[in-house]
Amino acid sequence: IITTLEQAERDRIIINSKKYEERALAPVVSAMVGGSPHFPSGYRLKKQTDNFIWISYDTQFTSQGILIYKYPVVAGKQMMGLDEILEENAEMLKNNVPGMFENTYMMTSTFARPSIKYMKYKGRDFAEIRGFWEVYNDYMGGPFVAHAFYNQDGTEMIVMEAFVYAPKYDKRHYLRQIESVLYSF
């Protein structure tokens, strides 16, 4: 029953996201990964490189962000395992998501090992990773959920990671909102 309720809420958020979509973001993401989630109004592009995009919805007290990145598949190497995904994730975060101070950057928390679950949604196989992020050498952190999957021709891994920073608030609602954006891909 809980899964059914979560799916109904996710579908409601996706419908709303499509209705009030921040349309300028779709071409940016599509150019890099061949498709795009539906970003609700208010989301803004924070950073873009050839293989990395950071999109965020920020308020005075909260931040909901989505990191989208890709990297080449290495022939003969397991690419969908948790350790392999986290290894690439560590490099992407360190190079692209700086903290507020020198020698600070976003990283996957080592406090609790993230979990991985293999799923199929709308015909797409993907690995869902859940865990916590933190800022190296600083006191920020929160939950994240990521979807990792192969591109259409199987030559690249694509990772879409949704994260929440809301130090004064319960993060469940914020995470479910932004997780719905991932499912709209």
Placement of each model-derived feature along the sequence:
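N-terminal "mature-domain start" segment
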Residues: 18-47, 183-185
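Long, compositionally biased interface segments
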Residues: 83-101, 105, 171-185
